[in-house]
Curated annotation (Swiss-Prot):
Pfam families xrefs: DCD (PF22769)
Pathway assigned to this chain's UniProt record: Pyrimidine metabolism; dUMP biosynthesis; dUMP from dCTP: step 1/1
Lineage: Bacteria, Bacillati, Actinomycetota, Actinomycetes, Mycobacteriales
Assembly information from the UniProt record: Homotrimer.
GO MF annotation, one: dCTP deaminase (dUMP-forming) activity
PANTHER family: DCTP DEAMINASE (PTHR42680:SF3)
Name used for this protein in its record: dCTP deaminase, dUMP-forming
Organism: Corynebacterium kroppenstedtii (strain DSM 44385 / JCM 11950 / CIP 105744 / CCUG 35717)
Gene3D superfamilies for the chain: 2.70.40.10
InterPro entries on file: dCTP_deaminase (IPR011962), dUTPase-like_sf (IPR036157), dUTPase_trimeric (IPR033704)
Enzyme Commission number(s): 3.5.4.30
Family assignment from sequence similarity: Belongs to the dCTP deaminase family.
Amino acid sequence: MILSDRDIRSAIDSGHLGISPFDPTMVQPSSIDVRLDRYFRVFNNARYTHIDPKQEQEDLTSLVEVKEGDAFILHPGEFVLGSTLEEFALPADLAGRLEGKSSLGRLGLLTHSTAGFIDPGFNGYITFELSNASNLPIALYPEMKVGQLALFMMSSPAETPYGSGSLGSKYQGQRGPTASKAYMNFR
């Protein structure tokens, strides 16, 4: 069951769902808007001949901070990581689905490649997988709305929510755009 605006506000007001900073105007009929932070991870294309998910490639990306009032320019075909301005704390009985904003999608901005699902128990900032499918560069401004998070009530709380020690939750507690930790799946 997807939470309605009323259910989202109730979950936040009761402390069941954590969102910080929380802006009540971001609550939509069946989702909550999410904003872009000022940090991006850009790929260092000249450092490697290819990306190898089995290897830890520490300098594959570099962190870039956009100064106040400036924009990050995402070029056609470019792929970077960004993150939400908001920090989330999902309880064991709520899961989330990140989607892009329709108005930005119509300009060619994709907010995630494959990782749009947010597990119950997740705590941290959500990483965006941003790409520009248009033929022109797109200006991305810190604090602009770039996505929406729909929340789903599960049939029962997860027995082992994300962040439980046995799961090896690689991205629990992440702050800012977090580079891939796919190499940990090969250990």
